A protein has these predicted regions:
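N-terminal pre-P-loop "Q-motif" helix
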Residues: 1-18
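Pre-Walker A (Motif I) flank of P-loop NTPase domains
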Residues: 16-22, 47, 108
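Walker A/P-loop
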Residues: 17-37
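Conserved Walker A/P-loop ATP-binding site and its immediately adjacent core
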Residues: 31-36, 42-68, 169
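Conserved helix-turn-beta segment of the N-terminal RecA-like "Helicase ATP-binding" lobe
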Residues: 57-91
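Conserved two-lobed SF2 helicase motor
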Residues: 102-120
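SF2 helicase catalytic motif II
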Residues: 114-117, 122-160, 165-170
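A short helix-turn-beta junction within AAA+ P-loop NTPase domains corresponding to the substrate/partner-engaging
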Residues: 173-174
């Protein structure tokens, strides 16, 4: 996969830093940076990665984008929308899905929304990496507990929080 120079710099920095923000204008390739980072982690060993989106439709779109490139992964959606992938909002089912993946040494990729992120928290599963797309949505009061939990949890690379911001104002500066 060929990355543009600014995307390669982002990936290099992500490999060096456990937490950070990627601020790139709309259409600048933030999703490709997430996918490239996730792909590297999956090659390195078993991982559970969570992708958080503000809306169900965006979670589904991100899932489609990831799965065009990453195919050796078990996928789950944690939101109330319909999807062709396994989907639940029940913490026990999330935990069972994780345990099954762990038993068989499978990488796991979970797509969720800010509204449902607390269900993953309640499941108690360890998360290696979490990507917050449109992270400005995470500051809403009823999302804050779950986002803070994942930002401060010390599971292997769970603390490697990548905050992805889509800032339309930056388009004017570019």
């Amino acid at each position: 996969m060929n990355l543009r120079p600014h995307q390669q710099r982002i990936i290099n920095k992500m490999n060096q830093t456990p937490k950070g923000q990627v601020i790139v204008p709309t259409g600048g390739g933030k999703t490709m940076c997430m996918i490239t980072d996730a792909q590297r982690q999956f090659v390195e060993g078993y991982n559970t990665i969570v992708v958080v989106a503000p809306r169900i439709l965006l979670a589904q779109q991100l899932s489609n984008d990831f799965l065009k490139i990453i195919d050796n992964v078990k996928v789950m959606h944690v939101h109330s929308g319909e999807t062709k992938h396994y989907s639940t909002t029940k913490p026990n089912d999330i935990g069972n899905w994780f345990c099954k993946n762990q038993l068989f040494g499978e990488n796991g990729l979970i797509f969720t929304t800010y509204h449902s992120l607390h269900k993953i928290q309640q499941s108690g599963i360890p998360v290696n990496t979490i990507y917050f797309d449109e992270a400005h949505n995470s500051v809403q009061q009823h999302f804050h507990t779950a986002t803070r939990f994942f930002a401060t949890t010390n599971n292997r690379r769970c603390s490697s929080l990548l905050l992805l911001l889509i800032i339309a104002i930056m388009m004017k500066e570019v």
